[in-house]
């Protein structure tokens, strides 16, 4: 199947702990509209265990926890990443810049994040304020630079609220509404910027325990993947199998960068107009 054409920039927005059923017009109008007018699946799966460190490391390396070995916060396993082909390293080899936009992060987590990012190939980290809207605005500015490349934006309001009050509780849905402000900024990219926007989550939550997500359960494992922008099909709800491991190959292919043979996911070719037309 043909690969997607090259876009000038790509943005990956990770909304930590966002369940697909929280994406509804009364809570997340911007993300709901983006999903309804572009390509999406609400049946994608994250990795096992369904925890943030394992999922983010899979996004950073293109391989599952059984290969990368990082399932809990810590610096001991970082050396294993050097034996892999991290996404950021691979992009740098192909002269594609990468930037990361995050909110206010506690110092211990920021230190761990910097160590993980350095082991995964390195990228410029920019910290915004507490409001997800500021993260979205920061990522939008990075994505519109002449040397944009890949921008990764991360917000964790849903995860914090889920652990404190329960997934799909009123505070959780309020947090989802705040995260939608980041989407509102980034959604402006999809019209005329030759940019690809991918919105996803690292895990769900509330499947067994209302305030957690680490045990095996479909609600904990199911995540949304929404693709919008350059060359993406309109108004398609996919029922084909997809996983979080498909995101790195899809981003690379959209940026015109070859996908390493070691990557365990696939390009989501069915999301792109060119591939659908040739099928």
Regions found by a protein language model. Give the residues of each.
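Feature captures the catalytic ectodomains and active-site-proximal regions of enzymes
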Residues: 1-279
């Amino acid at each position: 199947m043909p690969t997607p054409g090259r876009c000038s920039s790509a943005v990956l927005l990770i909304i930590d702990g966002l369940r697909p059923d929280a994406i509804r017009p009364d809570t997340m109008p911007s993300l709901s509209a983006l999903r309804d007018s572009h390509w999406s699946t609400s049946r994608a799966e994250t990795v096992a265990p369904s925890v943030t460190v394992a999922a983010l490391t899979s996004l950073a390396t293109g391989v599952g926890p059984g290969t990368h070995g990082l399932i809990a916060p810590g610096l001991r396993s970082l050396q294993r990443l050097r034996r892999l082909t991290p996404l950021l390293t691979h992009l740098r080899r192909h002269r594609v810049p990468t930037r990361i936009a995050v909110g206010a992060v506690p110092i211990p987590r920021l230190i761990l994040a910097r160590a993980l990012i350095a082991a995964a190939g390195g990228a410029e980290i920019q910290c915004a304020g507490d409001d997800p809207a500021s993260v979205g605005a920061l990522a939008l500015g990075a994505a519109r630079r002449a040397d944009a490349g890949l921008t990764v934006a991360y917000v964790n309001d849903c995860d914090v609220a889920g652990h404190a009050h329960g997934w799909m509780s009123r505070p959780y849905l309020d947090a989802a509404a705040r995260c939608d402000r980041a989407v509102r900024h980034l959604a402006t990219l999809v019209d005329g910027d030759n940019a690809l926007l991918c919105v996803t989550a690292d895990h769900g939550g509330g499947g067994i325990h209302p305030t957690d997500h680490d045990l095996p359960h479909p609600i904990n494992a199911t995540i949304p993947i929404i693709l919008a922008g350059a060359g993406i099909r309109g108004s398609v709800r996919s029922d084909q199998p997809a996983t979080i491991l498909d995101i790195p190959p899809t981003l690379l292919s959209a940026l015109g960068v070859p996908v390493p043979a070691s990557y365990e996911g696939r390009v989501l070719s069915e999301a792109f107009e060119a591939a659908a037309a040739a099928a």
